[in-house]
Amino acid sequence: MSRCIRIISLCFVLVACSPLVDVPATSTTSPNIEPVATSTLTPESTGSQPTQGIYEENVHLFDYDAGSPVQITEKAVEQEEGYTVHNISYPSPKGGDVPAYLVIPDGPGPYAGILLMHGSSGSRESLLPLAKDLVQTGAVVMTISGPAARTPNRDWIHFTEQDREEQIQLIMDLRRGVDVLTQEPNVDSDRLGYIGYSYGAAMGGLLAGVEHRIKAYGLMVGDGGLVTHFTEDRKPMGGFETLPAAMQARWLEAMEPIDSIHYVGHAAPSALFFQNAHHDSLVAEPDALAYQAAGSEPKRIEWYDSGHGLPAQAYLDMVSWVAELIGIDSSKFQGPS
C-alpha cells in the first residue's frame, strides 16, 4: 500500500508511539535491508512518487537569505583546558534568536566544523558534554537549542500548524548554524559534519536533503520524521490516536510535505551514517529500516544490541566514521564513560 493511501486511511484509524527523546556493546553491521510490510517505505519505493514529488514541491520551504552575514551575539566565554566555550546566539531567519554554544580549540587551525542537534526534550545543554569531547579531535563544535527548547514549557509537539512552523524554523536555524561555522576564520568550510541524536537524527535526514555543505551526516537512533513516528502501526502512547479525525487530517496535511523520509534520499553527495538499536522502545525497527532504506548513497548502517540509549561503542564508531570524511583525529575522542 502506498504511503499516501496509508496516510489518508490513518485519518480514521491511527496508532501512535512515544516521542523521540534526548538520551545523553556490541556493534553488528545490518544485513541487506529487505522490504518490511509495516514500514513507511521499502527499498524499491525509495525515491519514487509520492516522495520525489513531495520533495520537489516543498524543498523551497527551507530557503533563506544565505547571502547575508550572521550577526553573532557573544554572551560569555569560558576558557577550559585546550579550548574555549562561547555562549552565543544568532538571529533565526524566522524571528527570535537561536541560543548556541560554540566550542573552539586553542590554536589557529584550520579545523573541521561539527554541528550537533539534540533530542526532542533536550536543548543545547544536552550535547555540550559531547561537544567538549569532540573539540579534542580538532573540530570547532556547535550545539544549538531548537525552537521548542526556547519556550518556557518546552512543549515540542502540539499536533497543530505550530509543529510545521517550528520544524521549518529548525531546519533554517541549522542551516544558519552552518553559516556561523563557516564564518569562523579557523574553520575549513570543506570539512563540515553533523551529528543528531533521536529527534536530532530524524531532523538530520531532512537537513541532509537541503544542506549539502555538510559532508557527513551522523544519524543516531532516528526515524523518518514526525508523521512516520506518530502514524505507523506502533504503540498508542503518543497522544495522536486520541485526537478527533479532522484534527488528525489537518496535522497530516501540514506535516507530510516536510517529513524527513521524503528528503533523506536527496542527501548525496553528502554521506549518511544510520545507527539504530534492536531494543529501542521509541524508534520501531520497521521505521528505522524504512529511514535507512530511503537514504541516498553513500551510506553506512549499523545496528546495536541496546535500547534508545546507544552504547559507548556507537559513539566511537560514529566519530571514527566522521573522522574519515572531515579529517579529525578520532584517537583523541574519549566518548561517554
In which residue ranges do the predicted regions lie?
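Short beta-strand element of the alpha/beta-hydrolase
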Residues: 100, 110-119
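Cap/lid segment of the alpha/beta-hydrolase catalytic domain
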Residues: 121-175, 229-237
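Gly/Ser-rich "nucleophile elbow"/oxyanion-hole loop immediately N-terminal to the catalytic nucleophile
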Residues: 158-198
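Conserved alpha/beta-hydrolase "acid-adjacent" motif
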Residues: 281-287
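Short beta-strand/loop motif that positions the catalytic acidic residue
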Residues: 267-268, 273-276
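Hydrolase active-site cap/lid region
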Residues: 203-253, 303, 313
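C-terminal catalytic histidine-bearing segment of alpha/beta-hydrolase fold enzymes
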Residues: 289-337
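N-terminal cap/lid segment of alpha/beta-hydrolase-fold proteins
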Residues: 63-108
